[in-house]
Amino acid sequence: MRRFSNICVILFSFLYATGHGASEEVMACLRQERSRVENPSQTIVNVVAENPAYLHCSVPPDAEHEIAWTRVSDGALLTAGNRTFTRDPRWQVSKKSANIWVLNLRRAEQQDSGCYLCEINDKHNTVYAVYLKVLEPPLPSPSSLQKKSTKLMANMSGDEVVLNCTVTSTDKDEEVLDVVWTRDGNTINFNDTEKYILKVKRDAGVVIETMRIRKATMEDDGNYACEHSQQKASQIVHINKAEAQTSNSATFPCSIFSISIFMYFLYL
């Protein structure tokens, strides 16, 4: 009876906030909740595509309980404790406080909409359900496109490829959202710290992200891009290995790299 009451409270809050009936998909998600107490966190999260999403899960205070986040649509285990198990680098988990865990989605896409479960390893096997709704972004106006620019520059530093992505907005009060890096259209996994290093600098209206590709070889060839909102700056990186000789009478073969770069700017 308590569980039914909790679901009714959740659905009433959703109806009040949205002004219309909850879909069967949302109701089916919330019915998967198993808890002796009402979920203190937000159970329905609405976010516009290309923005970050945060799903909260509260555990009993003064208790050492780990949690696991799963995606209902495919049963995928996303995180357990502070470890991430998905290969999608957009997903991360963090601990906001002693009893609040947050599933972070760096850049939400419409296909991320659906039901997510927070499972707590307490004696009651508590399960909290959170429904994520990713809304279609509004079409950008021509004036807003003119206010933003995205540039990507590349160079070599030793055996590393260094790519600098600069996002500039003429509106100093506008928050510059996360930049997404891709290679040949696939999101780059920055959890692979042996291969990639990412540093971010932020200032009023400007974000500079620097990506280093460590120990670059021809296998790292590709079309690298940094994307922000409706704009993308892209560079084709091609690494050639050559033989160099010293000017002395004795020669010592060594490997050097040269980089061929082609840059173009796209409006999506």
Curated annotation (Swiss-Prot):
Glycans are attached at residues 82, 155, 164, 191. SMART domains: IG (SM00409), IGc2 (SM00408). GO terms for cellular component: extracellular region; neuron projection membrane. Keywords: Disulfide bond, Glycoprotein, Immunoglobulin domain, Repeat, Secreted, Signal. It is found in: Secreted. SUPFAM superfamilies: Immunoglobulin. It holds the Pfam family ig. Gene3D superfamilies: Immunoglobulins. Residues 1-21 form the signal peptide. Expressed in PVT neurons and pharyngeal muscles. Disulfide bonds join 57-118, 165-226. GO terms for biological process: synapse organization. PANTHER family: DEFECTIVE PROBOSCIS EXTENSION RESPONSE 9, ISOFORM A (PTHR23279:SF36), DEFECTIVE PROBOSCIS EXTENSION RESPONSE DPR -RELATED (PTHR23279). This is Zwei Ig domain protein zig-8. The lineage of its organism: Eukaryota, Metazoa, Ecdysozoa, Nematoda, Chromadorea.
